[in-house]
Amino acid sequence: MPREDRATWKSNYFLKIIQLLDDYPKCFIVGADNVGSKQMQQIRMSLRGKAVVLMGKNTMMRKAIRGHLENNPALEKLLPHIRGNVGFVFTKEDLTEIRDMLLANKVPAAARAGAIAPCEVTVPAQNTGLGPEKTSFFQALGITTKISRGTIEILSDVQLIKTGDKVGASEATLLNMLNISPFSFGLIIQQVFDNGSIYNPEVLDITEQALHSRFLEGVRNVASVCLQIGYPTVASVPHSIINGYKRVLALSVETEYTFPLTEKVKAFLADPSAFAAAAPAAAATTAAPAAAAAPAKAEAKEESEESDEDMGFGLFD
């Protein structure tokens, strides 16, 4: 009987993962190292209605995906990334929103001897509150200290553990004595699967504004190269036309040949004082309508106030 129950459970698991792969176009492959059952339950509750978390043995997940490749060949891209303690987070919502929800469910954790550090750990300069009898402990770790008012004071920031290092017993003891929980554990996104494409989670940090600025930078680079080699493109043609017009204008100014667009330029070059006089006149012409509009508004306001006053007093005449 237990064997049959196990077989039934496997069959149901295969059906479930295939159903999720069919129903949800997007998913995360997440690492679940150091995530306990209580934290996993909290993550599932916070994602309820927005995403579905599925964990399982790697061999079973690979077998289920391989059996479904006929219907969805794009799933083969998932297989190389199913290694280690991983699972899936399926969703139809915005991937950035789900990513942020997973990050919000990380919990701080104390350093344990033998654990692999997921991040760098630095002990800040501080008064530890520990008695002088612990001085030798700090010296063994190469931490410079002094005794201040009967307690040990760390003089400068100390990099205690590097990313990827194994936490030693002394480092773990020190961090616990200082009440420092340097690590945070949760579901870590390793890969993103989106409608048949798979990519690194860093792509989610790229905003529309960043894409727009990168695109404009690319267009400028293309235009610059095309102008240099004389190869016309959509990006370079406007600049080529303007540069050509400038050359024709310069040639016309230097020669007797004139066309309508150069007559005004030649006139200003012949008499620069006319250009100096034209600039204030143009500014005055622009400012005149605005200046005329201001008194008109003031007069209209006064008339409105007078009419309001007449209406108010006229009721009692």
Swiss-Prot record:
Region Disordered: start-end pairs: 293-317
Gene3D superfamilies, per the entry: 3.30.70.1730, 3.90.105.20
A single GO BP: cytoplasmic translation
Subcellular location: Nucleus; Cytoplasm
Per UniProt, location of the Glycyl lysine isopeptide (Lys-Gly) (interchain with G-Cter in SUMO2) cross-link in this chain: 297
Keyword NADP among record annotations: no
UniProt similarity note: Belongs to the universal ribosomal protein uL10 family.
Post-translational modification: Ubiquitinated at Lys-264 by RNF14 and RNF25 in response to ribosome collisions (ribosome stalling).
Cross-link (Glycyl lysine isopeptide (Lys-Gly) (interchain with G-Cter in ubiquitin)): 264
Keywords for the protein's UniProt record, in alphabetical order: Cytoplasm, Isopeptide bond, Nucleus, Phosphoprotein, Ribonucleoprotein, Ribosomal protein, Ubl conjugation
SUPFAM superfamilies cross-referenced by the UniProt entry: Ribosomal protein L10-like
Primary location class: nucleus
Modified residues (Phosphoserine): 304, 307
Record PANTHER family: 60S ACIDIC RIBOSOMAL PROTEIN P0 (PTHR45699), LARGE RIBOSOMAL SUBUNIT PROTEIN UL10 (PTHR45699:SF3)
Residues where Phosphotyrosine is found: 24
Domain of life: Eukaryota
Residue ranges, compositional bias (Acidic residues): 302-311
CDD domains assigned: Ribosomal_P0_L10e
Quaternary structure annotation from Swiss-Prot or TrEMBL: P0 forms a pentameric complex by interaction with dimers of P1 and P2. Identified in a IGF2BP1-dependent mRNP granule complex containing untranslated mRNAs. Interacts with APEX1. Interacts with FMR1.
Cellular component, GO, one term: synapse
Full protein name: Large ribosomal subunit protein uL10
Modified residues (Phosphothreonine): 59
Keyword Ubl conjugation: yes
Primary role: Ribosomal protein P0 is the functional equivalent of E.coli protein L10.
